[in-house]
Every structure is written in structure tokens, then in C-alpha cells.
């Protein structure tokens, strides 16, 4: 039996988290949402996490800091950044650290789903 992938959303925008939850569940994913990097880390990320959708600007620890910490403590969880603040330097930094994609808010559903599909492909 094939497990349904778990997509974790870390974004402080409740409305966006709820919208992503609805979209991702509608196409068959399991979804878990967190309002901050700290809340996500306190929940102790599991190996079940197939992909992380992550905002850059978060209260407390930002998305790039979370990406760095996860690389040290949890190996490689595929990360897709979704942000309203994607400048070239931030985009380059995220991609150099292993992000699958950096998408700008608002991002078309098709672009997001394509990025998730790419993140879930075996490497």
C-alpha cells in the first residue's frame, strides 16, 4: 500500500495556510500547517514529511534559517519557498542551499503543484 505524501506548510498567513490545505487535500495529499518555524520544530518533524512549503518572512526564525537548521538536523526534506519577498539574492541563496523552487505569492496553483511533483520525484 502506497502512503499518501505529507506536505507541511509553514506560513504565518492563516488564510494562505487554509487555502493551501484545501488545495493540497483536494488533489490527494495529507497536509499539516504551522504558523511559525518554531511551531514546526516543536512538533518534531518526522521522516513522513515529503515536502515543506515555506515562507521566507516568518515571525521569529525566518524560512532561510529554518532551511539551514533542517539541513543540519533532519537531512534533506525537499523545500519549496512561497514568498511575496523573493529578490534575486534570496532566491539564489535558497536554491544554493537546496530548495526545489522559489515561487512568488500569489502563485498559480499549477506552478505550485508542478513544483511539488518535482520535489516528490526520487532523486
Predicted region positions:
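C-terminal output helix
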Residues: 89, 107-117
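Acidic catalytic/metal-coordinating carboxylates
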Residues: 35-36, 62-65
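Alpha4 helix (beta4-alpha4-beta5 surface) of REC/receiver domains from two-component response regulators
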Residues: 65, 86-101
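The feature encodes the CheY-like receiver
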Residues: 17, 59, 87
Amino acid at each position: 500500500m502506497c502512503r499518501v505524501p505529507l506536505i507541511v506548510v509553514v506560513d504565518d498567513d492563516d488564510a494562505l495556510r487554509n487555502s493551501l490545505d484545501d488545495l493540497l487535500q483536494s488533489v490527494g495529499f495529507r497536509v499539516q500547517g504551522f504558523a511559525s518555524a518554531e511551531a514546526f520544530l516543536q512538533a518534531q518533524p518526522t521522516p513522513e514529511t515529503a515536502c515543506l512549503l515555506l515562507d521566507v518572512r516568518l515571525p521569529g526564525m525566518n524560512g532561510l534559517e529554518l532551511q539551514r537548521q533542517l539541513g543540519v538536523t533532519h537531512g534533506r526534506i525537499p523545500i519549496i519557498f512561497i514568498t511575496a519577498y523573493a529578490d534575486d539574492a534570496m532566491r539564489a541563496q535558497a536554491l544554493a542551499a537546496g530548495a526545489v523552487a522559489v515561487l512568488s505569492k500569489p502563485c498559480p496553483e499549477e506552478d505550485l503543484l508542478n513544483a511539488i511533483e518535482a520535489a516528490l520525484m526520487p532523486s
